[in-house]
Amino acid sequence: MGLEDERKMLTGSGDPKEEEEEELVDPLTTVREHCEQLEKCVKARERLELCDNRVSSRSQTEEDCTEELFDFLHARDHCVAHKLFKNLK
């Protein structure tokens, strides 16, 4: 077994036509991006960004943005849960 054979095993057949396959798109990513544009998610993201800016501007603080992060993720994932399974086969 030579070096060329090993390359073919690692990368496929070595045929450039096979390597130009259509790139698959994860439906979860697409639905998340759509849901992040909805009003409830936009407001939650704004609260998260305000908190992040507030915490980042201070050198000494006990505050973190865990609650705001979870609120944003909950709002986004709630939207995703209702839309994602319609896109799956």
Curated annotation (Swiss-Prot):
Major localisation: mitochondrion
Record-level GO cellular component terms: mitochondrial inner membrane; mitochondrion; respiratory chain complex III
MF GO annotations: ubiquinol-cytochrome-c reductase activity
Compartments (UniProt record): Mitochondrion inner membrane
Mode of membrane association: Peripheral membrane protein
Cysteine-cysteine disulfides: C35-C79, C51-C65
Renumbered residue ranges of the record's region Disordered: 1-27
Residue positions where N6-acetyllysine is found in the record: K40, K83
GO annotation terms (biological process): cellular respiration; mitochondrial electron transport, ubiquinol to cytochrome c
UniProt keyword annotation of Transit peptide present: yes
Keyword entries, A-Z: Acetylation, Disulfide bond, Electron transport, Membrane, Mitochondrion, Mitochondrion inner membrane, Respiratory chain, Transit peptide, Transport
Residues annotated as transit peptide in the record: 1-13
Its biological purpose: Component of the ubiquinol-cytochrome c oxidoreductase, a multisubunit transmembrane complex that is part of the mitochondrial electron transport chain which drives oxidative phosphorylation.
Family affiliation: Belongs to the UQCRH/QCR6 family.
Subunit: Component of the ubiquinol-cytochrome c oxidoreductase (cytochrome b-c1 complex, complex III, CIII), a multisubunit enzyme composed of 11 subunits. The complex is composed of 3 respiratory subunits cytochrome b, cytochrome c1 and Rieske protein UQCRFS1, 2 core protein subunits UQCRC1/QCR1 and UQCRC2/QCR2, and 6 low-molecular weight protein subunits UQCRH/QCR6, UQCRB/QCR7, UQCRQ/QCR8, UQCR10/QCR9, UQCR11/QCR10 and subunit 9, the cleavage product of Rieske protein UQCRFS1.
Entry protein name: Cytochrome b-c1 complex subunit 6, mitochondrial
Provenance organism: Mus musculus
Gene encoding the protein: Uqcrh
